[in-house]
Every structure is written in structure tokens, then in C-alpha cells.
């Protein structure tokens, strides 16, 4: 795969993380650049690892994985999205404290859910002449950039939305999950 195809793939794969990080940035109400960069790093690392895992799986059992990856991604994103919506509706101070304490693991779970399509791409890459390490690094770097940018965009949207920002973030995650499911079921091109 040539450089331009790799970059197109990398930035295409980063769009789910970009959308999810906009919602996350909006729900945090003025996240600092350090928080945005941390989010970008988490999303980028996970998004770089999953195509390598998919590539390894593709060498052995692609038909079994491809049947279920979209259901797993949809389920994770739906559950995380519903949790954000419920927390946005409740919006009690003690729950905000709890969310901040567990923020790292919620970010990791969201990153995993949005990167399952990268794992599926990795399965497909196992059948092509590609350097999987270079491709995975490109995907990870593009995702880090886009997720960091998404958080900063969310920073400006959050104050406008107020308490509804977390609800919007949950709706975005559910929307990403539904999109992944519909694409894999053949309803979207």
C-alpha cells in the first residue's frame, strides 16, 4: 500500500475517535489541552494496537471474527452512550466526582469500542502486501491528532450546551455504534 492510501486509511479510521472525543470534550466543560492530549494518546495507542491484533487474527481466523466485531462495537458504544445520557440527566455533584475518578477507564473502553473497526481492517490487511507496523503507526498518529482536535472542539461546544453536553456525548457514541452496525449489516455503503 502506498503512502497516500495509508494516510487516507489512517485518517478515515480516526473519524469515530474524532466524533467520540468531541462529545467527551463537550461533556468535560473546558478541558485543558493536557486532558485533550491524554485523550488523543489513549485513543491513538488503542487505535494503533487494534489493527495489529486484527492482522494477527486475520492470518488465522478471519471468518469468525468478522461475523461478530460489529455487534461487539455496537454493544460497547450503546452501553457507554446510555451511561453518559443517564449521568447527564441525573447530573448530581457526587456522580460527577465518580465520573472523574473513573474517567481513564471510560476513555479506554470508548477507545476500544471505536477501534474495533480498525481491528476488522487489520484482518483485511493480513491478505494484502502491507507493512502492518507502519500502517498501524499511521493510524495511531492520525487518531491521536484527530481525537486531540476533537476534544478541543468539544471544549468550545460544551459551555454552549451546558448540562446537555454529556447527553449529546452519549447520543454521539450511540450514533457511532448504530452506524458501525448498519454498515456491517449492509444498510449503509
Curated annotation (Swiss-Prot):
One of its GO terms (cellular component) is plasma membrane. InterPro entries: Mntp/YtaF, Put_MntP. Disulfide bonds: none annotated. It comes from the Bacteria. Belongs to the MntP (TC 9.B.29) family. Probably functions as a manganese efflux pump. NCBIfam families: PRK11469.1. This is Putative manganese efflux pump MntP. It comes from Serratia proteamaculans (strain 568).
